Swiss-Prot record:
The protein, known as: Large ribosomal subunit protein bL27
Prosegment location in residue numbers: 1-8
Gene3D superfamilies reported for this sequence: 2.40.50.100
A molecular-function term among this protein's GO annotations: structural constituent of ribosome
Family, per entry: Belongs to the bacterial ribosomal protein bL27 family.
């Protein structure tokens, strides 16, 4: 009588994969809402590239971050047909 026994207590490993990792989110997007009061230097919008363009009293940093250059109220506006901009107008 011939018996075919298989033992799995010392089975070889399953190898590795090229997947299995991910990077943390970069926390991009709007940091202040339309109509919100801001101070000089406040970050308004974090972005990669120019999704939104700087308007009145708004500067653009080296990483394309938009920030307030004066105290006032935030306004998200259309710029032409297919572009958007953010401006800061002095509070009355």
């Amino acid at each position: 009588m011939l018996m075919n026994l298989q033992f799995f207590s010392h089975h070889k490993g399953g190898g590795s994969t090229a997947n299995g990792r991910d990077s943390a989110g970069r926390r991009l997007g709007a940091k202040r809402a339309d109509g919100q009061t801001v101070k000089n230097g406040n970050i308004l919008y974090r972005q990669r590239g120019t999704h939104i363009y700087p308007g009145v009293n708004v500067g653009r940093g080296g990483d394309d971050t938009l920030f307030a250059m004066a105290d006032g109220v935030v306004r998200f506006e259309r710029k032409g047909r297919d572009k958007r901009q953010v401006s800061v107008y002095p509070a009355k």
